[in-house]
Amino acid sequence: MEFQSIAPDVKLGENVTIHKFVNLYGCEIGDHTKIGVFVEVQKNAKIGKNCKISSHSFICEGVTIEDNVFIGHSVVFINDTYPRATNGQGRLQTEEDWKVEPVLVKRGSSIGSNCTILGHVTIGENAIVGAGSVVTRDVPPNAIVAGNPARLIRTIDFPTHPEDKEARYVLYEFLRNQRS
């Protein structure tokens, strides 16, 4: 029984790990990248080297993810600013009826679980996007953003270790205060 759908035009780097129930169409995935279960990566999407794409994430056409990026569980990228079912003539839209709004995630960034990243956004190098955030505009390099819409919490001097307790504490405190 087949548990993956990998189109013949997919370009896979060396030592790529692809878990079950994954759909890959016309995309590029760099060396040593891990793709979790129930992930879909559409055509013309690019994922760099040493990335981790966690389960249930959706990476649509026009998304570029550079090297060393972490994508949490259930992250959704959106490439259409004004999605509609039908075109101006009242017919079901086709690929010719819409324009892809690109998304760029720069190297070393981390996007927390359950985030939504809207089209025409750049997430800067080493940025951290807090879990559950909705990113509607560009995120500066070395920034921590969180919320709906995501807003700047603070910047961090990089390089930092992925287990930087100060960065995690700042993000935790922000999210905790949002609930109260």
Please place each PLM-identified region on the residue numbering:
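Conserved beta-strand-loop-alpha-helix hinge in the C-terminal portion
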Residues: 141-166
